[in-house]
Amino acid sequence: MKSSMLPAIAVSLLAFGLAGCGHAEPPVPTPVRRSVSVATASNAGTDWPCFLGPTHDSKSSETGILTDWPDTGPPVVWQCPLGISYGIGSVTGGHYYQFDRYGDEARLTCLDAATGAFLWKFGYPTDYEDHLGYNNGPRCSPVIDDGRVYLFGAAGMLHCVSAENGSLLWKVDTAERFGVVQNFFGVGSTPVVEGDLLIVTVGGSPPECRDAGRYNMDMVRSNGTAIVAFDRRSGELRYAAGDELASYAVPQLATVDGRRWGFLFARGGLIGFEPSTGAIDFHFPWRARVHDSVNAATPVVVGDEVFITETYGPGSALLRVKPGGYDVVWQDPPGRDKAMQAHWNTPIHHQGYLYGSSGRHKSDAELRCIQWNTGKLMWSEPRLTRASLLYADGHFVCLGEDGTLRLVEATPEEYRCKAEVRLRDESTEEPLLREPAWAAPILSHGLLYLRGRDRLVCLRLIPDNDGVRQPRQSLSLDGRR
């Protein structure tokens, strides 16, 4: 099968670029002092410490967003080039953390979240090569918790470093330790923190399977390590569970009827488990018959119901979970008529409706709204390419993979686009966000962070109290203008 038939997924994604992007080696990092006129992040608002944000659903609680956009879009605060990677960063404590690759080094870079000024970096060697010709950089977003940053590289190296200065605290080579056969696009499921545990999608295999090539992936079996939990402070193994292989959806954690649950959309279907022990409640088979297929959209949990979706075959299903099992509320029928077929971009639930990009390819993707409890299609809008969403203040910030940024009203009545813009460099008129722009936008303390193939752009989505438009800053990842 040609690689063009398999759009790269990360989720995690999510978040992507093309091989050869970025800089082989940036200049030696030099901190930059900023004048007082440069925008600073508002004291109000929330951090965005992990993939899909603090509530794990790509929804922001911040309000007062700019809805009347000028022709050039919301004000650009700062921007910088990126290395090779697919993921968007994370924001905590006034710092922005970005995970990229430069040459043969995977690198975490810490920047001032409001100015883009370089603070420090941490790196480690990597020789990962993608089977399908997509880029060789990280797919996962950094996870920040309790003064630590967790990194999960494309080759399966798991690192924990200090969020203050990048010093190494512990590391585990999950591919070597658990016998992971390289997946279609490498490792792309961002870990999650649960109490004292770091829960990681691993999906290892017994020794007799480890020489299988990518064309024999259906012959690869699990060794019971679909879900692996480590002590988040020490890196010690706490448990391994699940007879499944890894895919690209991020584990989802939720409280259902007073009990903590974990949901992992693995290669062959959805696993419901107890996150503190790894005890498995159920496995719901849900995978396309296509050999080169993945499950990449993170499960969406509302009350005691869990929504899953994929784009290669069966489509979507809604389950009602209970200890030891589940009931199917609805699922897409066989054939072509599917409610939602999200690829890597996780849909967002809002007031009884689900909004997301449905479609396997750029050309056939639609932005859709469906009814949560029935799957009924409320509206669809073509031509937006595969898009990623962020909910804030009654609207969706919608980033198409072609780099087009839109503001869409969150309503089931019809598609209502309030603004549409292609962000451009003021001096060259070149697009700031080049295709593919596969990472979902993030919002933290009024600042909107977006990435395209090789550039990170920070916008002021929520105006400062004084309403003053701040000057642009164009930086490199080492902090130089």
What positions do the PLM features span?
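Noncatalytic, solvent-exposed loop/strand surfaces
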Residues: C21-R481
